[in-house]
């Protein structure tokens, strides 16, 4: 049985990704933050929930090491943890940037690094990190300075890791969604047409495809999933 990690497993996207991989025969290990009370109703024999603060480097490394000791390898990882904040240049202090850096980059790097090293040993594996338009395109980050800067480093990380993994079967991909159709966004953006947005299940489908054997020859560093948003 193949093994996948999904960070932020209790979020809208996280749950969709967990379900997709379980439905396709994976054993999924999902991370949640301490004191997360969101119920996760997945089959116990196919899903393992682990509480870990990915902002803490040592805890993140221990999580990966424990997982490898238990399962031997990891085939795919989908890193959905992150945070969001509004703010123009005038409104954004370095402390705001530091917070978004920690939420959006450190939480990804702390787990991507040990996973990357393990996958290089295996000579196989896919890591997917959820990016954002403001991180990819500065013009899309107007009014989201700290958030855009924090997310932008994810793209550079993927480039550097892919360069280091050249010649292996290890690929790091940044998935850039448009507006995601979630209850929270429907409440926050009234009057918009959710049909133009991207459903979490659609993102999960695309991620699973790129993790599957069908996409073994593809090495896409960035996947844009915008719909009409």
What does each model-identified segment do?
Residues 43-58:
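Rossmann-fold cofactor-recognition segment
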Residues 103-121, 162-163:
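Amphipathic alpha-helical dimer-interface segment in Rossmann-like NAD(P)H-dependent oxidoreductases
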Residues 10, 14-18:
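N-terminal Rossmann NAD(P)H-binding glycine-rich loop of SDR-like oxidoreductase domains
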Residues 2, 73-74, 119-132, 167-171, ...:
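Active-site loop of short-chain dehydrogenase/reductase
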Residues 126-159, 163-166:
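Catalytic loop of short-chain dehydrogenase/reductase
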Residues 7, 74-82, 104, 129, ...:
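Rossmann-fold scaffold of SDR-type NAD(P)-dependent oxidoreductases
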Residues 167-170, 174-175, 182, 191-229:
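C-terminal helical subdomain
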Residues 83, 90-109, 124, 128, ...:
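Catalytic Tyr-X3-Lys loop
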């Amino acid at each position: 049985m193949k093994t996948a990690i999904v960070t932020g497993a209790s979020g809208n996207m996280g749950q969709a990704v967990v379900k997709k991989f379980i439905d396709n025969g994976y054993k999924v290990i999902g991370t949640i933050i301490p004191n997360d009370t969101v119920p996760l109703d997945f089959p116990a024999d196919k899903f393992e929930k682990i509480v870990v603060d990915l902002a803490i480097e040592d805890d993140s490394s221990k999580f990966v090491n424990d997982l490898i000791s238990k399962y031997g390898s990891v085939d795919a990882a989908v890193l959905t943890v992150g945070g969001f904040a509004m703010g123009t240049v005038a409104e954004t202090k370095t402390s705001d940037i530091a917070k978004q850096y920690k939420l959006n980059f450190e939480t990804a790097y702390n787990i991507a690094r040990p996973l990357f090293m393990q996958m290089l040993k295996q000579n196989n594996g896919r890591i997917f990190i959820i990016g954002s338009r403001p991180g990819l395109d500065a013009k899309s980050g107007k009014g989201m300075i700290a958030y855009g800067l924090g997310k932008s480093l994810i793209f550079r990380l993927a480039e550097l890791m892919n360069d280091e993994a050249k010649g292996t079967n290890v690929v790091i991909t940044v998935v850039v969604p448009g507006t995601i159709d979630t209850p929270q966004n429907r409440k926050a953006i009234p009057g918009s047409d959710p049909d133009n947005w991207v459903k979490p299940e659609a993102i999960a489908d695309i991620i699973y495809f790129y993790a599957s054997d069908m996409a073994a020859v593809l090495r896409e560093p960035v996947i844009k999933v915008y719909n009409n948003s």
